[in-house]
Amino acid sequence: MPVAYQFKVTLIHSNPPVWRRILVPEGSLDDLHKWVQTAMGWENAHLHRFDIQRKHYGDPEMLDDGFGETRVIDSLGVQLADLFDRPRPAKRFTYEYDFGDGWMHELEFEGIVDPPRGKKPPCCLEGERACPPEDCGGVWGYAHLLDVLADPNHEEYEQYAEWFPNGIDVEVFRTNEATKAMRQGLPRWGD
């Protein structure tokens, strides 16, 4: 039976919570980034970083602070087994996406499991609510956006309604679409 790692991914401070439960095969921490991106519904248009047990993981060239004070370990070279298939694995850690908007996610490692019948990793087992749109100002900007769209008398309503003519259905989430996205991989930019 192949190894499968199970994680619950929750967008921190989202209310009501936006979350996914994913099952992934052995791979690198960079692969986990790709699976989180696609399961959540992000577009991979910004930088990201994992913070696990007081260490930072990501792309060292992109995340160098210029002062040599923040050491970033290359996520391409770190296997999930290195972090989670050991006596004292990290149980909870964070994943930040888009340092401008500051989308913080808590990842809870739920264990190394046998995949449920009919579920081949990578896949999304369950989740709730739509991913917020990119570049809307983080969790607080998203809440403001939803407030504006809910009030046709709001002074910013026309502008926001132009960007989102059909509104935003925050409750829409389809597990099968998240699984399909996880298997297809990240969007290709510049094609």
Stretches found by the model and what they are:
Residues M1-D191:
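Short linear regulatory motifs enriched in tryptophan with gly/pro/ser
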